[in-house]
Amino acid sequence: MSKLSEIEALLFVAGEDGLKVRQIAEILSIPPTGVSQSLEKLTAKYEADADCSLALLETSNTYKLVTKQAFAELLRAYSKSPINQSLSRAALETLSIIAYKQPITRVEIDDIRGVNSSGALAKLLAFELVREDGKKEVLGRPNLYVTTEYFLDYMGINHLEELPVVTDTELVAEESQLFGQATESELE
């Protein structure tokens, strides 16, 4: 592993905050002049590589990795895409219910939430976090909903089993907190 790649990794993890030369020097136990030379090499490397989307930005002796100006329009379009917008509380509640109770119908979701979930469900379907997965074999044959592979990616997990274990008691307590109601145990 080269010092150059170590500096690059540190700058990547530092994100928008960036790092000062002295911080990098302390972390890597090298003199600040060595860090400055490596930063110059990294800048030259990014500038020379037309296929690289990264650039090194220095402001007030703080360095950070940024995307090259040439990608501004692309990134603006991405930031306006629907999935990059945050999910509403209703959508998050609905998504949680589907994740833990799938396959589940909209009416069953409504019963748990106590309100109509059609809007939240439509948003989750549009974002491809959930999908229809057949029909429930009851009167009216309502659609069943399950989470998608994209949901797993969005949550940063590989399998549904990696979701935190939540007991029914915790769900009731959480729901009562959400809706300002007291559970039986709180009333005793």
Swiss-Prot record:
It is found in: Cytoplasm. InterPro entries: ScpB_csome_segregation, WH-like_DNA-bd_sf, WH_DNA-bd_sf. One of its GO terms (biological process) is chromosome separation. Keywords: Cell cycle, Cell division, Chromosome partition, Cytoplasm. It comes from the Bacteria. One of its GO terms (cellular component) is cytoplasm. Its main location: cytoplasm. Participates in chromosomal partition during cell division. May act via the formation of a condensin-like complex containing Smc and ScpA that pull DNA away from mid-cell into both cell halves. Homodimer. Homodimerization may be required to stabilize the binding of ScpA to the Smc head domains. Component of a cohesin-like complex composed of ScpA, ScpB and the Smc homodimer, in which ScpA and ScpB bind to the head domain of Smc. The presence of the three proteins is required for the association of the complex with DNA. PANTHER family: SEGREGATION AND CONDENSATION PROTEIN B. Belongs to the ScpB family. This is Segregation and condensation protein B.
